[in-house]
Amino acid sequence: MTIEYLKKASLTSKSDASDVQETVRAILADIEAGGDQVALDYAAKFDRYEGSIILSPEEIEAACAKVPEKLKADIRFAHDNVRRFAETQKATLTDVELEVVPGVITGQKAIPVDAAGCYVPGGRYSHIASAIMTVTTAKVAGCKHIMACSPPRPGVGVAPAIVYAAHICGADTIMAIGGVQGVASMAFGLFGLPKAKILVGPGNQFVAEAKRMLFGRVGIDMIAGPTDSLILADRTADPHIVTTDLVSQAEHGYNSPVWLVTDDRALAEKVIEMIPSYIADLPEVNRDNAAAAWRDYAEVILCADREEMAATSDRYAPEHLTVMAEDLDWWLDRLSCYGSLFLGEESTVSYGDKAAGTNHVLPTSGAASYTGGLSVHKYMKIVTWQRGTREGYKPVAEATARIARLEGMEGHARAADVRLAKYFPDETFDLTANG
């Protein structure tokens, strides 16, 4: 059976993408040339904010005092889960040594980058969870200086809950600046801060483009597009839960794709029927986003069986992948292309987005086919080292000289020759290239 689209997207994120490169390139160039003052000018223009950029300890304390105790407890709960998961990830990175030949020791070390810049969105929604996800993971990795920047609200500043989350999760500096100017401030080391060695966190198309342009000068977690989600559901799935989860992810933005892949026509048709009323029940801003995302970007796909469903999912390589079907272990073993996987009706992407412990900074736009999401590993440099005895390196030197000459790299060969001549003056070696 060829897959059947019961609903097909009329747009794709690529067809919707506007050309922001010129704008971002100009802002980055202006800020790099003009420094702090130009960044302040852009903050006043775009954020309509003229307060302190670097929050003082007193400002942090005042902001934290505004956060209700129940919300503080929830943030601490989420932070603890993310921290413990990140610590478990870090434990998989062990320093190793191997004696490749007698007398030559090679090794691997994992070294955290010195300074991390965490972008925390604060526009339409105050992304408290993004502060938790990015700052906590950088702290566990061992970064010496962690910066968190977030767009301030005019006359208000950064949302107090974001300040509280960034503070308790380990941010050394909290900045009231967003957009390209926020990313640039961290990358260029403005306002007396160290230059970020890596930039992480979600953001709008301008933030994503700024990170893309800066990549190479600094590291980045990924180039993120609109968030996307796919649900795999069979006849056992509850259409109410499926519909609720699709709508919950569509509210991210007008161009956030959501996909339902199923082998049960009745389920698919029921979900299509239910979606409009579920969207209509949302608050206005959320409703407008979800309605546009469902209308323009959503798809409902009917497959013959679970193997075809799995193959379809892997082809889409979604950021978020939920399975509501029988035999969850089969799906866990079979599926291979996703940012984060949520198995069973009991799980939901919203848990991962906010508090379950896995990171919500994930690859979008099909990038899950070749990369994973934000983790401790993104903040770490995996470096290698070696040392050895003269005798141990002797066969390595001989092989190096011959390979280098065969490649035409005489300078490399001579670096081996000189050592053999110095350490073994009474021996003769055949170091010619016979290829």
From Swiss-Prot:
Keywords: Metal-binding, NAD, Oxidoreductase, Zinc. Its EC number is 1.1.1.308. It comes from the Bacteria. SUPFAM superfamilies: ALDH-like. InterPro entries: Ald_DH/histidinol_DH, Histidinol_DH_CS, Histidinol_DH_monofunct, Hstdl_DH, Sulfopropanediol_dehydrog_HpsN. GO terms for molecular function: histidinol dehydrogenase activity; NAD binding; zinc ion binding. NAD(+) binds at Y119, Q181, N204. The active site is at E319 (proton acceptor), H320 (proton acceptor). It catalyses: (2R)-3-sulfopropanediol + 2 NAD(+) + H2O = (2R)-3-sulfolactate + 2 NADH + 3 H(+). CDD domains: Histidinol_dh (cd06572). Binds 1 zinc ion per subunit. GO terms for cellular component: cytosol. Gene3D superfamilies: 1.20.5.1300, Nitrogenase molybdenum iron protein domain. Its cofactor is Zn(2+). Zn(2+) binds at Q249, H252, D353, H412. One of its GO terms (biological process) is L-histidine biosynthetic process. It holds the Pfam family Histidinol_dh. HAMAP family: Sulfopropanediol_dehydrog. Catalyzes the NAD-dependent oxidation of (R)-2,3-dihydroxypropane-1-sulfonate to (R)-3-sulfolactate. Belongs to the histidinol dehydrogenase family. HpsN subfamily. PANTHER family: HISTIDINOL DEHYDROGENASE, HISTIDINOL DEHYDROGENASE HDH. This is Sulfopropanediol 3-dehydrogenase.
